[in-house]
Amino acid sequence: MKSWGPLSRHGTAEGGRGPPRPARRTPGLSSHQVPGRMSGVAAGKPAGPAEQPLVAPELPVQPAERPSQPSDLRARAAELRRLFTTFGYLVAKQGATAVLGLAYLAVATHLFSARDVGLAAAASSTAFFLGAIGALGIPLLLVAELGSLPVALRRVTFSTGMYISCLTVLILSLGTLALSPFLGGSLRIICADSTTAVLFVIGSVATMGALTFDNAAIGLHRGSAQLWRGSLNSALKLAVVGVLVLVGARTAPGLLLACALTLVVSFVCIPMLRLKPTPAGEGNLSHRVALARRYGVLSLKHHILNLSINSVFYIVGLIAALLILPRQLAYFSTALLVESTAMVIPYLLALALFAEISGDQSLLHRHVRRTLPLGLALCGGIVIVAEVAAPLVLRIFGPGYVTDGTTALRLLVLVGPAYVIKDHYVAIRRAQGRLGHAAKVMAAGTCVEVAGAALGGIYWGMTGLCAGWAVAASLEAVVLLPAVLRVFHREPPVEPRSALRVSQL
């Protein structure tokens, strides 16, 4: 889900007929999971035999029967269709919103001053940073668990997660308002007057709500709901900017109004999630508290891991807002938006991988063999095109963006290949139930990336920030690559059923 300003990243899958996802249970607070191994929660614990083992002479051992080749081919085809159905909806949503978002930014950069675009980008970066902190892992928890819950519990689980995350972001945004006079010139806009302050708070909370909605749609395999919400938001934003131009309100607060208002209106798509009404008594406060306790630990594990990998984007945007003047920030924000739009398809491959693997290690191996080469190939092609065509792309936004943004765009796209490796590493560790280990590794990597971007920005400005980030991310990817290649090359052993029965004799 992209940002609300110019700086913006049980059943069958909708449209497919693959086998249903295995149901997954989520542990309570007392559950324990051995690092490095799949627990019964994540992968399903092997059930014991239904009857007592027979005495050896009474049970002739038959050779293991190999599954029929046609059945195996049909199962593999269903896996592939399900994976790329989820991926297809993600691409459609991002493609539609990207085209409309770029159109919006092209209009804004031509009709609004670079300073106003930069100030709106600073507010946007701050809002998305608050959303990253206030999410508490709830959006990713909904991706992983919502589809496997009983139908009657889905609405109350979704709404409880929405309330908690939005309330957290509301508190954080109010705190940011109080501190904004001390956060640099680009961020002082959010407390310039009461109207702008209200728009900032509403936009921050609505950004969190939209992120929660989109992830719930992925978890429920309601890709069309995510597609419609994102498209409606982007189309309305473009229309509101047109109205602002007609009435002469070409200011940074006007851009904030367009983004906040359209995010709120896009929630009319909530019925498209097709959530059943909550049974009487299931939506009361005590039941919601019980849900929060049940899923709290797992959600926070997702949150720590998500912060350790995705917080880099928000922190880099915040670093730019603190170190770069508003005009330069507009050029950086535009280059970053173009880069994130171009690189979203490789990222969505990894997200589809996480949504479909369901803790099945053999399925994980097969899907990684599909998504990793495709992601790297797409990313490599995008880098080549961007290095050559960067000035032509930025010309859409005006001559100033070509002059001052081309180098930034060429450096930023070099981050893309590293993130294909990072995103696959995270999806693999989640499937293996090794959230704690992955969080530590990714936290260290995030510190390296942030340090590279900050040092580059301090000493060499916008160009140094982009170059420092690209170098640090590439070094991190080199460290993570062996773990990804192990899953890519090695299929986990599967113990034949007949061997299991013989061992019980």
Where do the language-model regions lie?
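Helix-loop junctions and terminal segments of transmembrane helices
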Residues: G134-V151, T278, E339-L363, R430-A431
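Membrane-water interface segments that mark the loop-to-transmembrane alpha-helix transition
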Residues: T85-A98, A123, F128, A132-P181, ...
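Membrane-interface junctions at transmembrane-helix termini in multi-pass inner-membrane proteins
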Residues: A206-R229, G359, L414-V441
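Signature of the first transmembrane helix
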Residues: P53-V61, E65, E79-P139, L300-P326, ...
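Interhelical loop/hinge segments that connect adjacent transmembrane helices in multipass membrane
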Residues: L59, E65-L83, A192, S224-W228, ...
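Interfacial segments at transmembrane-helix termini and the short loops linking adjacent helices
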Residues: R76, S180-F200, P326, V388-V420
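Transmembrane helical elements of multi-pass membrane transporters/channels
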Residues: T85-L105, Q226, G230-N233, K237, ...
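Hydrophobic alpha-helical transmembrane segments
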Residues: S194-V201, L227-T278, T446-V448, M462-V487
